[in-house]
């Protein structure tokens, strides 16, 4: 896909423009310099064309350790891009950092560079504007004027990108293999970014000892063993009491958005330290999503082990995450690249279980046999009797059980029926949901069998 990198110094509105172009609020917008630290990817559409955009961190001439890492990410974006947007601000005088960015871009000889002047909402059309003339000094020709925050000039910008680069119409993907979207969550410094670097086999996400270095959710397309994946990296989740206003709170929201966009969650914990209340809170977020979870126990290489160590830690996890009893537990060492291949093995197993459709006749055979084997207890003045069951269309396995009266359902018997369905049809690694309805009720979305 044709890819455009958005480059500029801090606070010229790169993230605002990125969000406007892809029409989704993916990148965090803030007046604080260097809010964007990694490369953020998104896709915009314009007149049957699709363009991938890369939001980048702000380039400055000063070389702090963090700025050096940001510059590595920016240069990687420049190498990946087919074209470049050089973004400057109309509301401010040209700075030395603007000229530094221009100097970097002038070294690129094989890619078109489009100068875009942002924050130009007060610019009068067809009027002589002395302030606009200064931008010609960069040597990139006539600029395109936009206001990302007001949505002004975005159509003209997209027209220029399509026309200048002769982009063909997009006719849709030929892929028949559905994409599996998964995110990596966990408290700061458990090794999420290092894991992603290993999984994608390139240095895509900033790795730093500074807690909370990754702030945005980063979408990374992957293809492993013929399966398409979209890996969403997220900022480490802090305790709510420690989330500062502004950027940290926005990152927390981005993590929740990443969970909402995912099919599967990788919940990462530090195996070298005792599980904490913070881990439990994050596990609660995963449980509340009602989607499959894989628990990754990282830094297992640092643990002094005997024959019972792994079993003991699994028991602790099951106690801490009681509502994630279905979640596979994988012990890994990202640093030593140990057992990372099992992550994609588990993802494949989960995907197969998510797409599994059960014959209505087989499902009812299992339910009736379960009731014959173990009759429901008396509860609230009656005894549950399930007469019919169907699987419904949903992201995760959902089953509707028609019964004499839903109020007779005791939680222990519901768990018994759930376990029977799991055992009979191989739903070992995914959450399943049972809905008990009166036998006279109607249900939409029933799977065809």
Curated annotation (Swiss-Prot):
GO terms for molecular function: GTP binding; ribosome binding. GTPase that plays an essential role in the late steps of ribosome biogenesis. Gene3D superfamilies: 3.30.300.20, P-loop containing nucleotide triphosphate hydrolases. Disulfide bonds: none annotated. Residues 2-169, 180-355 form the EngA-type G domain. Belongs to the TRAFAC class TrmE-Era-EngA-EngB-Septin-like GTPase superfamily. EngA (Der) GTPase family. This is GTPase Der. It comes from the Bacteria. HAMAP family: GTPase_Der. InterPro entries: G_ENGA (IPR031166), GTP-bd (IPR006073), GTPase_Der (IPR016484), KH_dom-like (IPR032859), KH_dom-like_a/b (IPR015946), P-loop_NTPase (IPR027417), Small_GTP-bd (IPR005225). Keywords: GTP-binding, Nucleotide-binding, Repeat, Ribosome biogenesis.
């Amino acid at each position: 896909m044709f890819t455009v990198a958005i480059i500029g110094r801090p606070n010229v509105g790169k993230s605002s423009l990125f969000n406007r172009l892809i029409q989704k609020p993916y990148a965090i917008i803030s007046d604080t310099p260097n809010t964007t630290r990694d490369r953020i990817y998104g896709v915009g559409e314009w007149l049957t064309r699709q363009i991938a955009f890369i939001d980048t961190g702000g380039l400055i001439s000063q070389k702090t350790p963090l700025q050096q890492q940001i510059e590595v990410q920016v240069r990687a974006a420049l190498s990946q891009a087919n074209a470049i947007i050089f973004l400057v601000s109309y509301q401010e005088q040209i700075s030395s950092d603007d000229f530094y960015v221009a100097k970097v871009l002038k070294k690129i000889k094989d890619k078109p560079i489009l100068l875009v002047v942002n924050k130009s909402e007060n610019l009068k059309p067809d009027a002589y504007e002395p302030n606009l003339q200064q931008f010609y000094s960069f040597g990139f020709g006539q600029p395109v004027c936009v206001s990302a925050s007001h949505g002004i000039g975005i159509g003209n910008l997209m027209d220029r990108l399509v026309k200048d680069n002769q982009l063909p119409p997009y006719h849709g993907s030929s892929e028949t293999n559905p994409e599996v979207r998964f995110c990596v969550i966990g408290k700061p410094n458990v090794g999420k970014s290092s894991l992603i670097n290993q999984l994608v086999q390139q240095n895509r996400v900033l790795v730093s000892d500074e807690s909370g270095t990754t702030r945005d959710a980063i979408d990374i397309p992957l293809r492993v063993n013929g399966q398409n994946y979209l890996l969403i990296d997220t900022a480490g989740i802090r305790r709510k009491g420690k989330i500062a206003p502004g950027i940290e709170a926005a990152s927390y929201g981005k993590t929740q958005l990443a969970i909402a966009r995912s099919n599967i969650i990788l919940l990462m914990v530090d195996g070298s330290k005792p599980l904490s209340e913070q881990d439990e809170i994050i596990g609660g977020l995963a449980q509340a999503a009602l989607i499959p979870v894989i628990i990754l126990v990282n830094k297992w290489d640092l643990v002094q082990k005997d024959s019972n160590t792994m079993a003991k830690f699994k028991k602790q996890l099951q106690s801490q995450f009681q509502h994630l009893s279905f979640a596979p537990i994988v012990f890994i060492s990202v640093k030593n690249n140990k057992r990372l291949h099992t992550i994609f093995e588990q993802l494949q197993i989960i995907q197969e279980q998510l797409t599994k459709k059960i014959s209505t006749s087989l499902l009812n055979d299992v339910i009736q046999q379960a009731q014959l084997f173990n009759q429901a207890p008396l509860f609230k003045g009656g005894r549950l009797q399930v007469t019919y069951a169907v699987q419904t269309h949903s992201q995760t396995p959902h089953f509707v059980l028609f019964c004499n009266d839903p109020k007779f359902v005791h939680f222990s018997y519901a768990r018994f029926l759930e376990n029977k369905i799991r055992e009979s049809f191989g739903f070992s690694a995914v959450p399943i949901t049972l809905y008990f309805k009166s036998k006279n009720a109607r249900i939409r979305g029933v799977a065809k069998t």
